Amino acid sequence: MKTNSDLYQVTTHAPGPAGQLPLDADFLRNAPSGDVFGLTQDAGMGWPAGQLRRKEFLILSTLGGLRAPDGRPIALGYHVGHWEVGLLAQAAAEEFARQGAIPFAGFVTDPCDGRTQGTPGMMDSLAYRNDAAIVLRRLIRSLPTRRGVLGVATCDKGLPAMMMALAAQRTLPCVVVPGGVTLLPTQGEDAGKIQSVGARFAHGLISLEEASEWGCRACASPGGG
């Protein structure tokens, strides 16, 4: 077996971001240590050090999958509903930054009960709502410097979870952004009816060709239910 000596040249240090954190004596002396270290983290992720300590806003979404900038799927999500909500979150983040604020983003993806239908995964669909709402609330509290929260979510699991999480924020301004809907196919069946193709084929109500074609085009665009 051949070895490459470069494998053993492990990088352990780097120069780090240039600049200085916008600290003052009062902040450094009295702020929670997490607020100070948070600035170090922010600079480490590439935000210009001189622009830190501005108003911070948290964007939460149910984004799933990995979508290339040209729309090509790198890794699929659980359903088309959360496939492009990242674009909405990105637009919101860019607007926050344009207004002089600092956007943060966090994600709690959601399942699809259509995908789990007829499997043990159905046991997790409704339970997901409460579980995800708890996680979303924990993410909100885990950014202590946030001034408000914007939630982007779709479908009948992710959107209720987001709404429950934001409704619990009694001292923060919050906005819910529905992620849009899936367009209907010009010809064929919608994403609800198409889920019964197996049963209808078994009863001779549709042909194999119809099931194959309609099933391919039923989700005519990304979007949620």
Language model region names:
Residues 1-225:
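Metallocofactor- and cofactor-centric catalytic cores in central/energy metabolism, strongly enriched
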